[in-house]
Structures are given as C-alpha cells and as structure tokens.
Amino acid sequence: MSLNFLDFEQPIAELEAKIDSLTAVSRQDEKLDINIDEEVHRLREKSVELTRKIFADLGAWQIAQLARHPQRPYTLDYVRLAFDEFDELAGDRAYADDKAIVGGIARLDGRPVMIIGHQKGRETKEKIRRNFGMPAPEGYRKALRLMQMAERFKMPIITFIDTPGAYPGVGAEERGQSEAIARNLREMSRLGVPVVCTVIGEGGSGGALAIGVGDKVNMLQYSTYSVISPEGCASILWKSADKAPLAAEAMGIIAPRLKELKLIDSIIPEPLGGAHRNPEAMAASLKAQLLADLADLDVLSTEDLKNRRYQRLMSYGYA
C-alpha cells in the first residue's frame, strides 16, 4: 500500500520517494555493476531515524491530522484483525439502518462480546454511504439496541469511537438527534455488563460520547477527544479556521492531557509513524489492552460496575 504523507511528514516522504526510485531501478536491471542494496538500506535507516525524530515532538494539531489520516484503521479493520466470527447486526427497529454505526457479536480470544463502533468510508461512494462517520439518531438507537441485547445475554460491550461528530442535518434533528444521544448516555451509565470504550481516531463531541460511557476508556496514542473540532473552536473564538493549530493546543484534545485530567484510563501506543503504518501491530496492542481491561472488570459484581461508573461520571469536571 502506498502511504499518504501529511504536510509535516514531507521530509520522510522525500526519503521514501528516493528509496522507491532506487528499488525500482534495482528491479529493472539486476545486471547493474553498482550495489544499490547498501544505499537502500542506509536510506531506510535514515527514514526510520527521521520518523522517530519527527514523531517525538508532535503538537496537538499534527496529532489531530493523524487522527483523521485517510489510511488510518477503522472499526471494521480492527474487527477483522483482532476478533473472530463477527456477525453484523443492523437496524434500530424503528426507522432505518445507519451505516455510520456498525455493530454485532464477535469473539475476543474465544469470548463472546458485543462490538459497536463508528465507521467512516475510504472511497467516495463508501464515504457517502457511511455519511463520513457521522451518525444520525437511528445509528445511536441501533447502538442502544445492541447494548441492551448484550446486557440480556451477559456479554461485555466494546465500543470504538471515531467520528467528527453526530450528523447535524435537519432530518437528524427532526428525528431526535439530541434525545438519542442523551438516552444513550443515560442507558450506558446503567448497563449491568462491562463496557470498554476506545477512541481510535476522532472523538468528536456528543457524537463520540453517545457510545463512550464505559468502565474503561482508552485512547490510541494519536487519537483526539474534544467537545468541538479545532477548526470549529477557532471559528468561534478567533473568527478564523486558520487558527485551528492554536485552538488544538488550547483545547487539550490529545491523549496525554486527557489522561492527566483523568478523563481516560489508558493510552495505547501506536507503531512508529501511526496506526496506518502497521495495522496488524496496532490491532495486536489494542487486543491486549481490551483483554486486560476485561480481566480487571470481570471480578466486579453488577452493582460494583454500576457504582464505579456512576462515581466516574460524577468525578468529571473536578481537578
């Protein structure tokens, strides 16, 4: 797969282009008198060192760009890589099946679990079908239906958060967008089974929170979680979306800051260069964290789960 490089990765992109050129020449003419392999190896090492240097000092705005990377793994990618026997369940049994939310039963290391997550698209047609990962009310009602099903069958719930926000269209508002989000917040706080939530990309406002109330909340290293996008915040405070980098820093949208504020529990490290560089390794790390979280929660009674979740929610907003 050919990688898409972000603006701040251009020095890496230039090195990788040189490597690709030399590799192509080597393949075309194996009778060359010069040894290209040594030069390719040297450039690869230099690329790794440069990547490590750049990624050691990323700002909030650069991390926000990584969270939106078009090649970043989505919910269904992690389902394929970390789970077995996934059976997707569709529809809210009231209006429609919202493709921006996917969910179903799967096995995690042999254990039945309910998976629910936002799903963006990659190609244009899929992006439109998935509404760019922005759920309508029927998506959140589908999610709630699956959560209640999981509770009936005593299955842990695992959610993956990756949305710019809930869909703000007129139709969504007419069908009760705010009510659907609010109901999910309330009902998730009452669930009698373990709930583990992980932000895998963008965690945008109420659209993220509607499947984000859990006993454990994790973030991938280069994901974001915020009440509004940096561009939206900049447009309100500075009357210009160009101030988005400044807004990103001020808002505290990245995982280390949110862990410092005790809004999340764990930060899951990503492969060098981001999750899209090695989805298999990222899925393995994610799976290990999910198994560890469920092991911690399995020893708790239903009442303990509910009480801990309540205390967690009530602690928000206090330093």
UniProtKB/Swiss-Prot annotation:
Give the UniProt subcellular location, in the record's own words. Answer: Cytoplasm
Q: How is its activity regulated?
A: Competitively inhibited by pyrrolidine dione antibiotic moiramide B (CPD1).
Domain CoA carboxyltransferase C-terminal spans what residues? Answer: 35-296
Q: Which UniProt keywords apply?
A: ATP-binding, Cytoplasm, Fatty acid biosynthesis, Fatty acid metabolism, Lipid biosynthesis, Lipid metabolism, Nucleotide-binding, Transferase
Subunit note: Acetyl-CoA carboxylase is a heterohexamer composed of biotin carboxyl carrier protein (AccB), biotin carboxylase (AccC) and two subunits each of ACCase subunit alpha (AccA) and ACCase subunit beta (AccD).
- Tell me the protein family, please: Belongs to the AccA family.
What name goes with this protein?
Answer: Acetyl-coenzyme A carboxylase carboxyl transferase subunit alpha
Q: Which gene encodes it?
A: accA
